[in-house]
Swiss-Prot record:
Its main location: cytoplasm. Its EC number is 2.5.1.17. GO terms for biological process: cobalamin biosynthetic process; porphyrin-containing compound biosynthetic process. InterPro entries: CblAdoTrfase_CobA, P-loop_NTPase. Coiled coil: none annotated. This is Corrinoid adenosyltransferase CobA. It holds the Pfam family CobA_CobO_BtuR. It is an enzyme of class 2 (transferase). Homodimer. Belongs to the Cob(I)alamin adenosyltransferase family. Pathway: Cofactor biosynthesis; adenosylcobalamin biosynthesis; adenosylcobalamin from cob(II)yrinate a,c-diamide: step 2/7.
């Protein structure tokens, strides 16, 4: 491809991108969902949260399911003023106690509702929320209501597999992560600094 043809092609791309950017003028908080069976949902959420903190935004985090071991995202973000509320019961297949898991979920959800109502928070991460709805630990209607009632500038990031259709419909941005290959399938254990 000649330099002239390359330049013409790139100019067309630039014109299309510039036109789309010019049309997108609304400023408001959005709902982002990272779902699917692939690795990286929580990683994507915390990468976005770190970006927000880097720009001086106030971020709150609620972690469902995870939380019985130290994790890098908390070690990084908490010293920068990010509030973490963690269910801290571990994986539900380990606890095998529906009543206790539901109670723990509801307790940490109270913090989530508080964060979603807080006009000082620019972003709230609800890590692994999808499981809480799927397992009927949290009423879907209560989650939808809290999301709809949040301050207009607040962005919410929801992670987890099998996100309920009503949450997907409410979301502004949905990314579905698909597994292609995973080290765990080859017998490589979860590693600090990579997986947690």
């Amino acid at each position: 491809m000649s330099d002239e043809r390359y330049q013409q092609r790139q100019q067309k791309v630039k014109d299309r991108v510039d036109a789309r950017v010019a049309q997108a003028q609304e400023e408001r908080g959005i709902i982002i969902v990272f779902t699917g069976n692939g690795k990286g949902k929580t990683t994507a959420a915390f990468g976005t949260a770190a970006r927000a903190v880097g720009h001086g935004k106030n971020v709150g985090v609620v972690q469902f399911i995870k939380g019985t071991w130290p994790n890098g995202e908390r070690n990084l973000l908490e010293p920068h003023g990010v509030e973490f509320q963690v269910m801290a019961t571990g994986f539900t297949w380990e606890t095998q106690n529906r009543e206790a898991d539901t109670a723990a979920c509801m307790a940490v959800w109270q913090h989530g509702k508080r964060m979603l109502a807080d006009p000082l928070l620019d972003m709230v991460v609800l890590d692994e929320l999808t499981y809480m709805v799927a397992y009927d630990y949290l009423p879907l209607e209560e989650v939808i209501s809290a999301l709809n009632a949040r301050p207009g500038h607040q962005t919410v990031i929801i992670t987890g597999r099998g996100c309920h259709r009503d949450i997907l419909d409410l979301a502004d941005t949905v990314s579905e992560l698909r597994p292609v290959k995973h080290a765990f399938d080859a017998g490589v254990k979860a590693q600090m600094g990579i997986d947690y």
